């Protein structure tokens, strides 16, 4: 584990997310993690195209004496290492999450999952040998999309090579929009 440098995360983000920030190495890639509290570990896994900020209100309102909330940014999202579009697959993300789960000392965890973070989170925890003793499921699936699946316009937009790079890397979308709130 290494502490995330404040130079990497903009100051205005750190003010909104006043938690412990650190990076862990998962198979050669840096995964950014936010953590708050003591007690029972509860891992909150976001979906696509989200990041750990999704759980800000949860982090702000859960009693930190009873729960240790652990919020990783999936590889390629938030403040974790960025990857090429072709590297995003359920299998790759599941392996990265399994490596992440192995860094949690406790055998039993609570798990909050959203979107494709559901499949990635559950499969990663199982591969790491974790016992899931509490589960909150939000807008997810337990299987991969079937043939003929049609992605939303936003998912399609995020797959366009030049346009997605401009939006997400050059214009810092959605961070640039969040600054307005």
Where are these regions (language model features)?
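Flexible "cap/lid" subdomain of the alpha/beta-hydrolase fold that forms the substrate-access gate
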Residues: 2-20, 29-33, 49, 54, ...
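Conserved residues in the N-terminal Rossmann fold of short-chain dehydrogenase/reductase
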Residues: 23, 71, 113
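Conserved HGGG/HGGXW glycine-rich cap/lid loop of the alpha/beta-hydrolase fold
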Residues: 32-79
């Amino acid at each position: 584990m290494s502490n995330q440098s404040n130079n990497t995360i903009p100051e205005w983000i750190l003010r909104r997310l006043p938690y412990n920030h650190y990076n862990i190495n998962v198979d050669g890639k840096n995964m950014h993690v936010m953590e708050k509290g003591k007690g029972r570990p509860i891992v909150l896994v976001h979906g696509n195209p989200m990041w750990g900020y999704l759980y800000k209100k949860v982090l702000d309102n859960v009693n930190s004496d009873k729960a240790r909330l652990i919020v990783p940014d999936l590889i390629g999202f938030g403040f974790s290492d960025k990857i090429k579009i072709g590297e995003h697959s359920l299998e790759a993300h599941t392996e990265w999450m399994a490596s992440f789960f192995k860094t949690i000392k406790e055998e039993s965890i609570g798990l909050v999952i959203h979107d494709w973070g559901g499949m990635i989170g559950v499969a990663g925890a199982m591969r790491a040998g974790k016992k899931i003793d509490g589960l909150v499921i939000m807008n997810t699936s337990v299987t991969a999309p079937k043939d003929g699946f049609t992605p939303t316009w936003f998912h399609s937009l995020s797959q366009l090579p030049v346009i997605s790079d401009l939006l997400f890397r050059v214009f810092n979308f959605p961070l640039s929009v969040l600054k307005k709130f």
